[in-house]
């Protein structure tokens, strides 16, 4: 497998072709120092077999950005500790140097004086105007700071310096952003001038260090990203970078639009390997190694990119969050057991946008590396799991890995629970990867599956269990609205499961995630759809990277959205409601209920009377859960056994 072959980059060798590309994690200390959580995260990736890790957005100045920083000598030791740790696994460490594109000193002074409003106003101004206003003197100072940062990194044992070609540097390069009329603006040669000065500065202070350059491409049809170069100029710039001493080029999507879905597309919003046609053009223009990122999910995706001459090295970001042992499993011939990313963006991209730390909804160990681990139990137990949804299967998986005997009861004839309907709406089919992974793990771990069996206390006690984990799920709520039980009123879950199919004019009551997804599905099927929601937001729970796409779809299909509106009654041919403006009557042929879920009840008194230890996880645990909570609760409940 080419993916697992070594490759020479500059004066170093990578043991395979898999890198962890730069991602903001939120794990670092407030001053940007590598702290224990950050250290453990990267060490765990190295242990999993990746050959090259890039720490994203390492600032050479003291910024307010929640990213790593290396701006004073006191931070060197933490970086050295990390470099030593990943080197133990024959993994190379890189840092991506970036500048936040605002006047760091002026902003810091405003905040130091307590002028928070002035500081925020200054930052908003600079994010738009800094590229036009930064002086030659300031640029020279930035270059000096970069040089000092590189020297610190080299003394810490960092192997590779990646130049972040977006943000400040990409803004200089961009015809869409750079409006300067001096030697840094206008012509192609002028616009790339500062980028080349950065490369020269790195080579000046660290002649032997490996240089990687993240080359952002402004992709077209539609135009996405602003900071960077159009592909024709990107190809020419790549040639110049090689002549300037750069050892490797990392091709990525340009950013600067404010929409992270441009650079980290969620499920169904971009094709797999969507940067490949741009990456290949750059690879064909240079002789140095080229890496690529962008919705590369499976080993087959990655292998094809290398085999077809698209790139030499593959960046797996979200995929390694979902399964840090991705490479190890490939090396062991167990690629079928990789826990593949769904590209939901809930635990990763959304977390960073909300200033939380990086995680993955499918991996309960993310952010808790070496704190949460599955170790064999000292005593083998009999564990019964009630429910074969996400929480139940994760609990069964963890209990089995610990060495327990596990029996899982599921009332349906198939596993998956709500995953089976969650993967039905537009763009959501990639959620099936989670279902396939968990279902396969039940087989690999020899979990005793009792499908089509509604478990009761007598049935469970017959198994003589030591522990019972209840993951009985939830059900869609039928609200106490007049007319809610009429024959033309359908259950959203049943609609998603294709058990009930409305047509014509449809009113969806409830604008949460399920209601919004059901509305989009019905609109796509040709229905005339209205959504009525009591609160002020539609699909509030959806990923921030997906919501814009969802609302574009609503606009395309002319879905009527009514927020702050309460339904008062359902009639044979209308939904009656009221809001701040008065009464509303919506003519309809069908009504779909999506007002929320309620936990399924499961009586465990008889089990507890017999001394059986019982725990509840997932939707049935007091309140309906999302997939992140379902996985985490299933993991934690089983891991203490």
UniProtKB/Swiss-Prot annotation:
* Keywords of this entry: 4Fe-4S, FAD, Flavoprotein, FMN, Iron, Iron-sulfur, Metal-binding, NAD, Oxidoreductase
What cofactor does this chain's UniProt record say it requires? FAD; FMN; [4Fe-4S] cluster
- The source's domain of life comes to Bacteria
Q: Enumerate the catalysed reactions.
A: urobilinogen + 4 A = (4Z,15Z)-bilirubin IXalpha + 4 AH2; urobilinogen + 2 A = (4Z,15Z)-mesobilirubin IXalpha + 2 AH2
What EC number(s) are associated with this protein in UniProt? 1.3.-.-
Q: In which pathway does it act?
A: Porphyrin-containing compound metabolism; protoheme degradation
The active site annotation covers: 167
UniProt: FMN binding residues: 96, 214, 295, 317-318
Q: Which InterPro entries match?
A: Aldolase_TIM (IPR013785), BilR_N (IPR054629), FAD/NAD-bd_sf (IPR036188), FAD/NAD-binding_dom (IPR023753), NADH:flavin_oxidoreductase (IPR051793), OxRdtase_FMN_N (IPR001155)
According to its UniProt entry, one GO biological process term is: porphyrin-containing compound catabolic process
- Provide the residue positions that the database annotates as binding [4Fe-4S] cluster: 341, 344, 348, 360
Q: What family is reported? A: In the N-terminal section; belongs to the NADH:flavin oxidoreductase/NADH oxidase family.
Any further remarks? Answer: Bilirubin reductase is a key enzyme in the human gut microbiome. The enzyme is essential to human health, as excess serum bilirubin can cause jaundice and even neurological damage. BilR is nearly universally present in the gut microbiome of healthy adults, while the prevalence of the gene is much lower in patients with inflammatory bowel disease (IBD) and in infants, especially during the first few months of life when infants are most susceptible to developing jaundice.
Q: Could you tell me what this protein does?
A: Bilirubin reductase that catalyzes reduction of mesobilirubin and/or bilirubin to urobilinogen, a key step during heme degradation. Urobilinogen then spontaneously degrades into urobilin, which gives urine its distinctive yellow color.
Descriptive protein name: Bilirubin reductase
**To which species is this protein native?**
Mediterraneibacter gnavus (strain CC55_001C)
């Amino acid at each position: 497998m080419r993916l697992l072959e070594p490759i020479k980059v500059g004066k170093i060798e990578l043991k395979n072709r898999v890198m962890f590309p730069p991602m903001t994690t939120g794990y670092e200390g407030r001053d940007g120092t590598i702290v224990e959580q950050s250290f453990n995260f990267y060490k765990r990736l190295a242990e999993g077999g990746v050959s090259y890790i890039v720490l994203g957005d390492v600032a050479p100045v003291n910024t307010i950005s929640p990213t790593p920083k290396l701006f004073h000598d006191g931070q060197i030791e933490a970086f050295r500790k990390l470099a030593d740790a990943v080197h133990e696994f024959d993994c190379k460490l890189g840092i991506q140097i970036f500048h936040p594109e605002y006047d760091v000193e002026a902003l810091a002074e405003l905040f130091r004086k307590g002028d928070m409003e002035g500081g925020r106003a200054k930052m908003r101004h600079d994010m738009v105007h800094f590229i036009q206003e930064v002086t030659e003197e300031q640029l020279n100072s930035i270059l000096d700071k970069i040089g000092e940062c590189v020297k610190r990194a080299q003394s810490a044992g960092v192997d590779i310096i990646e130049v972040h070609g977006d943000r400040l540097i990409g803004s200089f390069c961009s015809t869409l952003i750079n409006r300067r009329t001096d030697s840094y603006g206008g012509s192609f040669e002028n616009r790339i001038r500062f980028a080349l000065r950065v490369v020269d500065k790195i080579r000046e202070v660290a002649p032997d260090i490996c240089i990687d350059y993240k080359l952002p491409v402004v992709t077209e049809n539609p135009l996405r990203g602003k900071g960077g170069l159009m592909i024709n100029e990107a190809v020419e710039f790549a040639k110049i970078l090689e002549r300037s001493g750069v050892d490797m080029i990392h091709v990525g999507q340009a950013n600067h639009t404010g929409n992270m879905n441009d650079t980290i597309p969620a499920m169904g919003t971009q094709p797999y390997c969507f940067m490949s046609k741009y990456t290949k053009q750059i690879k064909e223009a240079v002789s140095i190694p080229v890496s690529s990122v962008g919705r590369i999910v499976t080993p087959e995706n990655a292998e094809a990119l290398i085999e077809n001459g698209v790139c030499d090295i593959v960046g797996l970001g979200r995929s390694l969050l979902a399964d840090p042992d991705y490479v190890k499993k490939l090396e062991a011939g167990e690629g079928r057991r990789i826990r593949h990313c769904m590209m939901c963006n809930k635990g990763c991209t959304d977390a960073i946008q909300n200033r939380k730390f990086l995680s993955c909804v499918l991996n309960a160990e993310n952010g808790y590396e070496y704190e949460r681990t599955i170790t064999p139990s000292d005593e083998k137990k009999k564990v019964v799991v009630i429910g074969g949804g996400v929480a139940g299967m994760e609990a069964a998986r963890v209990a089995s890995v610990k060495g327990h005997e596990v029996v899982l009861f599921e009332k349906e004839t198939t596993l998956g629970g709500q995953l089976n309907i969650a993967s039905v709406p537009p763009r959501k089919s990639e959620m099936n990867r989670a279902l396939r992974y968990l279902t396969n793990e039940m087989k690999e771990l020899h979990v005793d599956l009792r499908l089509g069996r509604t478990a009761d206390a007598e049935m469970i006690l017959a198994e003589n269990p030591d522990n019972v984990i209840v993951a009985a799920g939830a059900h869609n709520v039928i609200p106490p609205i007049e007319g809610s039980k009429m024959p033309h009123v359908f259950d959203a879950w049943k609609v998603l499961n294709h058990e009930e199919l409305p047509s014509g004019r449809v009113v969806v009551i409830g604008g949460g995630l399920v209601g919004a997804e059901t509305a989009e599905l019905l609109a796509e099927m040709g229905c005339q759809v209205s959504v009525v929601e009591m609160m002020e937001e539609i699909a509030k729970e959806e990923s921030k990277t997906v919501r814009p796409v969802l609302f574009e779809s609503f606009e395309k299909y002319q879905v009527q959205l009514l927020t702050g509106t309460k339904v008062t009654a359902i009639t044979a041919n209308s939904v009656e409601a009221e809001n701040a403006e008065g009464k509303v009557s919506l003519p309809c042929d069908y009504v779909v209920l999506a007002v929320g879920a309620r936990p399924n009840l499961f009586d465990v008194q008889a089990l507890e009377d017999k001394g059986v230890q019982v725990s509840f996880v997932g939707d049935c645990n007091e309140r309906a859960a999302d997939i992140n909570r379902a996985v985490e609760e299933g993991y934690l409940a089983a891991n203490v056994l």
